[in-house]
Amino acid sequence: KISLLNASAFEKEVNGKLVSLYTIDSGNGLVVQVTNLGLRVVSIWTADKDGEYADVAVGYENIDRYLNNEGERFLGSIVGRYANRISKGRFMIDSVQYQLPLNNNGQTLHGGLKGLDMRVWNVDRISDKSIDFSYVSPDNEEGFPGTLNIKVRYSVTSENEFKIIYEATTDKPTVVNLSNHAFFNLKGESGGTITDHILTINADSITLVDSLLIPTGEIVSVDGTPFDFRNPVVIGSRINMEDEQLRNGLGYDHNWVLKRTEAKVRLIASLYEPQSGRLMEVYTDQPG
């Protein structure tokens, strides 16, 4: 049985724009609920090996908990304009230095103090299986140069794929790095630890980070390290090993350098939960 969240718990006016909850359905056993506040993935319903449904995306049951940043600010959201950390919030373009607001240990994380995760997005088109969203980030919003026109499509397919497509255009040179910050538990969101999930990542190397989680620029092989997931590994089996990178990340909080193939969109990771029999495969055209 699928217990969809009540849309009325998400209906609210935020900064003069209406926030709501939207549902897309594959028609074949995958139902996804999202809100236009930060394009948050609120729930993903799918069956286990016995046909029992559970919500495998970690999320909140009402909009106020997202607005109040209870717990994890980026829960299920789009992140940007720039995902991950920018050291000291500074970068140079064409000999001009830009300084961004600092919101994470003296760094800029996931777009700054009020990134794309806290913006109310326009809903441009809705069908049973897809939703098109857009947002115009004005020049100098959170310190970033250029007006950024962003379009994002969330869709599901009859093959039970959940797809996210990003598109962004700008009117002057800028930096942009969009991603999604969904959290998954294939036992169901109240299923407890995910350390017994089995993970595979098609990557030979990672980018090292320092103690503030800023990439050092060094790319190192995963050979002989707790970061080697080229063959299926139980997530928790090596997470407590003595390793500087695990210490810096308080576990796994890293970028894997994905293998390139002829195919633009390729399988880069899979996650399997033996108890439920749920398998999630991840495809991308991105490098990490």
Question: Language-model segments: what does each one mean?
Answer:
Residues 2-32, 36-288:
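An exposed, glycine/acidic-rich loop-and-rim segment of catalytic or binding clefts
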